[in-house]
Every structure is written in structure tokens, then in C-alpha cells.
């Protein structure tokens, strides 16, 4: 049974938003998509930026959200994680330019997934229109699971977000043919996970995909028009069904054209 209470038990939480985008490239639409976390007592956003601009400070202040600017001319993994620690952040948001330095960008993503003890939301600089339902990127979530320890932590994190979640599509990816017994056990596990979500007032459905894990997760996101993907971070041991490669979370975070939340 998944335990609840992944987020720190404190009245106020802080978000660290790391970006190398210039002022004209940074999407306010995307920021609006993240703002539903206000309902979870996230009261402050610390912007870790390579460029000194503060055009959003007043707008966020009008929404009763504190904000500050921290300058870092490189945005390397250790610098981002150090800033998150110094700011006592509960969640890291990373918004990197997809057009410049892809190899460097992917390397930073990989190191962050490996080393972070905090959940990281890779926004992937999406400019997709946010649904006008108040839930932003939490309106429709694809949750990829293999029931490993990391996946169960990701589910626990999502349960903490149940107040702002819309629809959840629970996805498991298999490789090769399963026996009738294995398929029955898989369906039972999916049903158990779905029940946990339903018991927490989360509208959830479950699905089985077959193929390369990262590719099928991205396919599921397209199939269900997801606004965000949630996946557990890399594990030393593979999941019970040996379905996830250690690099799946990294591949999804690098290749997706929508936000990806990786829970360590």
C-alpha cells in the first residue's frame, strides 16, 4: 500500500524555477499552468536565471505569490541543487532552451535526475495552450508505473497533489508476451493502483502498452492528450516485472514535448 504524505509537512512551501530562457522566450502561459500549486501552500517562487529580468515579479505579487531572482550564468546541476537547498525548496522546475545545446541540456537533465532528492518538473519549454479549467498542467496526467520503489514514491507524491489533479491515466509498459497468469496479475495490480486513486477522489483509468518503455509512455501522453507526464526516477534495481530501463525517466524527460515530473 502506498503511503501518503510525500511533500514536507509544513504550512508553506517554496518552488525553485531554473531557466536559461531569455525574457521574450519565457512562456507566461506555462507559468500559469504551474500556478495551481498555490492551493498546496506553495507561497514563493525563486527564479534561478541566467539573464537578469524581473517582469513577472509584480504580476506574481498581485496573485499573492512572493518571488525573487537569483542569478547563475551557467545553471549546472550542482548549482541548481545547491540553490534548491539554500532556498529550502520543495519542488524544482527546470525550463531549458530546447533549440540550443541539446547535448548539454540532456546531460544536465540526466545529472539532475540522478542526484536530486527533490521532485523535478522539466517543463520542456512548451507553449501549448493551457486548458481554462484552473488545473493547468495538472488537468490530465499520464502516470507511468512499474510498481518499483521509485514508482510508488511518485504515486505518493501525486496523492499529495490530489486537490489540484484532474484526470489521471495510469500506464504500464510491457515487453514481450505475457502468460495468462502474468496478464491477470498485471491487470490486478493496475486495478489496485486505480482504486487507490479513486479512493482519493482522483478520476483515474488504467492502460497497458507494449514496446520500448519511454516511447510507449510518450505515445500514451499523445493518445490521452496529457498535459503532463509523471514518472519515478532511476532505480538501482528494476521494477518487479523488469519493465523499466534505468534510463526511461531520462529519455522521457529529454524527448517529451510536454512537462515531465520526475520523482526521485
Task: Go through each PLM region and give its residues.
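Short, aromatic/basic amphipathic alpha-helical patches
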Residues: 54-63, 109, 185, 189-196
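A short, acidic, amphipathic alpha-helical segment used as a generic capping/interface helix at domain edges
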Residues: 192, 212-222
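Rossmann-fold cofactor-recognition segment
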Residues: 66-69, 206
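Gly/Ser-rich helix-loop-strand patches that form or flank binding pockets
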Residues: 1-4, 79-131, 223-264
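Small/aliphatic-rich secondary-structure junction motif
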Residues: 2-59, 137-181, 195-202
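Charged docking surfaces used in two-component/phosphorelay signaling
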Residues: 52, 71-77, 209-216
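Residue-level recognition of beta-strand->loop/alpha-helix junctions
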Residues: 46-49, 71, 124, 172, ...
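Short, well-ordered secondary-structure micro-motifs
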Residues: 104, 132-133, 154-155, 179-183, ...
Amino acid at each position: 500500500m502506498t503511503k501518503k504524505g510525500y511533500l514536507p509537512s509544513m504550512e508553506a512551501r517554496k518552488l525553485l524555477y531554473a531557466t536559461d530562457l531569455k525574457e521574450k522566450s519565457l512562456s507566461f502561459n506555462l507559468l500559469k499552468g504551474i500556478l495551481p500549486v498555490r492551493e498546496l501552500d506553495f507561497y514563493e517562487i525563486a527564479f534561478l536565471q541566467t539573464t537578469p529580468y524581473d517582469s513577472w515579479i509584480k504580476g506574481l505579487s498581485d496573485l499573492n505569490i512572493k518571488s525573487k531572482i537569483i542569478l547563475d550564468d551557467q545553471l549546472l546541476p550542482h548549482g541548481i541543487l545547491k540553490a534548491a537547498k539554500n532556498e529550502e525548496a520543495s519542488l524544482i522546475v527546470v525550463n531549458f532552451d530546447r533549440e540550443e545545446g541539446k547535448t548539454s541540456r540532456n546531460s544536465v537533465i540526466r545529472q539532475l535526475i540522478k542526484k536530486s532528492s527533490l521532485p523535478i518538473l522539466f517543463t520542456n519549454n512548451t507553449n501549448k495552450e493551457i486548458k481554462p479549467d484552473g488545473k493547468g498542467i495538472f488537468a490530465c496526467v499520464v502516470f507511468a508505473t512499474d510498481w518499483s520503489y521509485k514508482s510508488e514514491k511518485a504515486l505518493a507524491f501525486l496523492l499529495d497533489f490530489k486537490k489540484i489533479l484532474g484526470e489521471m491515466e495510469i500506464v504500464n509498459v510491457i515487453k514481450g508476451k505475457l502468460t495468462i497468469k502474468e496478464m491477470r496479475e498485471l491487470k490486478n495490480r493496475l486495478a489496485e493502483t486505480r482504486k487507490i486513486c479513486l479512493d482519493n477522489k482522483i478520476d483515474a483509468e488504467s492502460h497497458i502498452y507494449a514496446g520500448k518503455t519511454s516511447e510507449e509512455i510518450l505515445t500514451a501522453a499523445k493518445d490521452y492528450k496529457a498535459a503532463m507526464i509523471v514518472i519515478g526516477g532511476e532505480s538501482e534495481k528494476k521494477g518487479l516485472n523488469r519493465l523499466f530501463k534505468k534510463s526511461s525517466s531520462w529519455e522521457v524527460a529529454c524527448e517529451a514535448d510536454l512537462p515531465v515530473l520526475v520523482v526521485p
